[in-house]
Amino acid sequence: MKVLDADTVRSRVSLAAARGAVHDAFCALADGDVVAPDEFAMHLANGGELHVKGAHLGGPYLAFKAAAGAFPEGGNSGFTAVLDAATGAPAAILDDGGWLTEIRTAAASAVSARALARPDSRTLTILGGGFQAAFQVAALREAFGIESVTVWSRSPETRDRFAAENDAVATDTVADAVHGADIVICCTPSREPLVTFEMLSLGTHVIAMGSDLLGKRELADDVLLGADLLVADDVSIAGRVGELAHLAQAAERAVNLGDVLTGRSTGRTSDEQVSVSDHCGLGIQDAAMAQLVMTGGTS
């Protein structure tokens, strides 16, 4: 069994390749061509968490990702285990330290934006100034002709640092950050709504990906009620732990991203529509990244 270190993993996965692989994975999910069990999660008394997600996308490999975080004496860590789909034998350990999770999460946002944002979108707002926020900016710049980026974070130091490192403009309030943005990406651990519908402009596409556990939320109810289009990476999961979990009537009218990508559900039909995409993160994304690495960077 091979062990591929972080440098090797990173050398095999570009932003464009990740976006293509994640796009194909969502389409395969919609087509019913994947095996994707529910996530396994473990929460320890000391605050530490372990999350395991995986899938088989129909290719030569199946994979699962183990991600640990919030431990009091350590940071985030993770690895992906890859097995031969024909024999079940271990094929490789991808010792990426969680990097694949970061890029596959950002790739899903790029896929969502390409499918649902206005094609002429040029302005991007990021709520949150952490490691994932930087991946989001990079992924959206790769997928769109983004001309300006605005960032908000609760910490002035964090948002100023992020702005300097990512060629962005920092703002003091969420309302100022969101105003006039073509695409808004929420990637915070907030447990209280940050964005209200009145903050949004006509035609805005909102991606909420911080609400990946029950209790987290970034969008007020009126955003979910007022949006013309409600999409989730997986409606059933988002209805349990995502933004959609907070409002049953919103979950009832939401559609899966894969169904939009495959034409089963209607996407944006006018430049004035407000669209919302709720992302919890799926095992198919992790399997797609593993497939990329194992095939040398081709989706």
Language-model-detected regions and their locations in the chain:
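NAD(P)-binding Rossmann-fold cofactor-contacting core
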Residues: 142-164
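Glycine-rich Rossmann-fold phosphate-binding loop(s) that bind the pyrophosphate
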Residues: 128-130
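N-terminal Rossmann-fold NAD(P) dinucleotide-binding loop
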Residues: 133-134
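Rossmann-like adenosine-cofactor binding region
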Residues: 168-246
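Conserved beta-strand elements of the Class I
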Residues: 124-125, 275
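Adenosine-phosphate binding glycine-rich loop
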Residues: 215-299
